[in-house]
Amino acid sequence: MVNWQTLFMVSLRRQGSSSRYRYKFNMENITHQVFPRCKQAFKKANLSYEYCDLEGKLYNASLMDLQKMLLRDINAPRDHVFKIVRTDLVEKSSKKRIQHWEQIAPIFDHPLSLYENLLSEMDNDFKPSFEWQQLIEVRSRDDQLKLQRVVWPKSIFSNFCRGIGVKKNTYDRLLKQNNGEVPMFVNPANAKPLPLFQVGDDATIGEFDGIGIFPYFVVKHRAFFVTEVDKLKTKIISPLCNLNERKRTDKANAGRLLENEKGEPFYVDAKGAASRAADGNAVTLKQLLERSVSHKTLWSKQTNKDRTCPGDILRATILSNDFSIRQLRTEFCKNFILYNIFTILQRNKKSIRDFSNDNNVPSFRFNWNVWDSYIWKQYQEAESMTLPADQASLINYKTKYDSFLQDLQTYSTLVISEMKWNQFSIFQNNETSLSRFEHITLILQTILTKSKMIRIFQPNLYKFMQDDLRATLMELTGFTESINATIGPGFANEQSLQSANALKKLANQLLHFEQKIYAEKFRVNRPIQLRPLTLSTNFKIVILDKQNAIPEIFQTLLKFTTQITTYFVKDLSEVELHGHMHCIDKKMLDKSTFMYLYELKYNEDLKAVPPQKEKIVDNIIGLLSNDEEH
C-alpha cells in the first residue's frame, strides 16, 4: 500500500527554494486558466455540444452522477463543449447561470458552459438519459391499495411505464387483500392503468415495495410481455412528460435514489447521507466542496483571493470512487508531487538549447540508463490502456495511473540525485551529443505533455505544463519517433527489468527510512513545517549486499538520494559504527539484500520489550542476513 503522505514529504523536501516555483504560489493561477479557455471556446461558431441532463442544480448533484459526467468528459471528442440540461421543474423566469460555476468548471477537462438549458428549450433530437432516481408512491384504481416505495426513473420518463413489478410475497399479499384478484395500479403522471407483474428475487428492488416496468429502456422488462401485440407496445416511444405530468409524479415522490455502477438503484435517505458526511464521506458536490474548506492551507496561502480546492484534486477524488476527505488529502498529495516533478524542468530551462531557429537540427544519439528505460516502459504500458468507459474500467485505470505516478516520483528523485552527483557534467553537450540533462528533459517532457493518464486525472496542471513547455526540443529532434527503436534492444531482457526493479525498491526503502527520521506531521490546519536537514547527522543507513550484486553506479546514485550517510557492505562487520549507534529499523529487500537504519543514542534507557510479532520479524531478518551464501 502506497503511503502518499510519505511521498508528499519526500517531494516537499526536494522542492525549489524560490517561491516562484512553489506549489501554493502557482496553484490558483493554474486553476484559473480554465476561465479564459472556456470564454475562448464558446466564442467559436458551430459548436459541438455534449448535453448532460440533470435533475436539479449541478452544485447539488450527487457525486455518482458527477462521476458519470466526468466519464463522458474523458471520452468526448476534443473539440466538444459541455452544457447542462435541467430536466427537473424549473421556472422559466429563473436565472439560467450555473450556481458556483467558478468552482465547478475547473473539475472538467472540456469547457463547461456558464449557462444551463431547460428541457423545454431542447429540440426533439435531444434524449435525456434513463436512470433510476427516485422512489414514488403508487395507488390502486379504487385507492384501497398502495405501494409506498416503488423504484422509479426521472419524472420525465413516467409515460413510458407499462406496469409495476413486485416480488412473490408482495404479489401474494396484494392478491389476498384484493379478494384473490390481481389489482390494477395507476400511473401518477397520467392516470393510466399499470398491471401488476411478479418479478424474481434477482430483480433490482432490494428492500423496496416494487419497481416500475419500463421495457423500452430495460431489456429484461420485455420478458413480461408475451403476445405479439404486447411486444409491439414495448417498442412504442411515449412522449416525455409535460410540466403538469412531472408535477404529479413529483407529488408522489417518496425519496431519492441513486444508481450504482451496474445501473442498479439504491436508496439514499437524508439521515443516512448526513451520517456518511459526518464520517468524512460526501454524497453531493456541495458537501465535498464544503468539507474541503478545512484543508485550504494545503493548497493556498492566506493572501490568495480564491482558496477553493483545485479542480484537479476534486476531479481525481470523484474519479477515484472514494468520496471521503481522506481520499481528497491523498489526491492533493499526488497533485503536489506531479507539480514538483514538472518544476525540475521549469527550474532548469536555461540548460536546454533552443533549436527553434535552426533549420539543420542534428540527429542525436540517446544513451539510456536503466532508470530511464524503466520509466519509459511504464509510460508505454500506461498509454496503451484503453480509456475507461464505465466505473469498473475507471477503477482499473485509476489504479494504473497511481502506480505510474509512484514510479514517476521515484524516477524524479533519482534524477535529482543524479544532478547532485554530476552537477557540472550533467549539463555538458556538443554539436552531436545531447547533455545528460537534455536527455532527461526529453523523457520527462514527453511524459508530462503527452500522457493521456495525466490529462484525464490532472487536466488543469497538464495544460499548464503544455503551455509552459511549448517551445520544446522534443518536437524538433523527432524524439518520440526514434525512441522506441533506441530503447527496445537494451531493455527487452528480463535481467534489465530485474535490475531496474531492484533499484526502485532500494530507492523507495531509502526514502521510507528518510521519512522515519524526519517524521514531519502532515497537518491541514496550518502550514507543514519541515525539520532541519542536519537532523540526519545522527543517523546512518547500511545496505548489506551479500552477493555484491548492486552495481557501483547504483550505489553512487543512491548515496546522493538522501542526506543520510549511506554505506554498502558485503558483511556487517565492515561497518565502523560508533559505540552508541543502535539499529532502530531493518528491512529485507530480497534474500541477499538488507537495509538497516542506525541512530546515535546517548544515555539510552533500557528499551521496552518489542511486541511479539515485531520481535519474530526482526529475528527472521537477523537470521537471514547472517546466513552464509553457499
Curated annotation (Swiss-Prot):
One GO MF term:
RNA binding
- Which Gene Ontology terms describe the biological processes this protein takes part in? Group I intron splicing; mRNA processing
Q: Which InterPro entries match?
A: Cbp2 (IPR016424)
Keyword match Mitochondrion? yes
Q: Does the keyword Transmembrane helix apply?
A: no
Disulfide bond positions: none
Keywords linked to the UniProt accession: Mitochondrion, mRNA processing, mRNA splicing
The subcellular location is: Mitochondrion
* GO-annotated cellular components: mitochondrion
What's the main place this protein lives? mitochondrion
Q: Where are the transmembrane segments?
A: none
Function noted in UniProt = Appears to be specifically required for the splicing of the terminal intron (bI5) of the cytochrome b pre-mRNA. Can also stimulates the splicing of the omega intron of the precursor of large ribosomal RNA.
**What is this protein called in UniProt?**
Cytochrome B pre-mRNA-processing protein 2
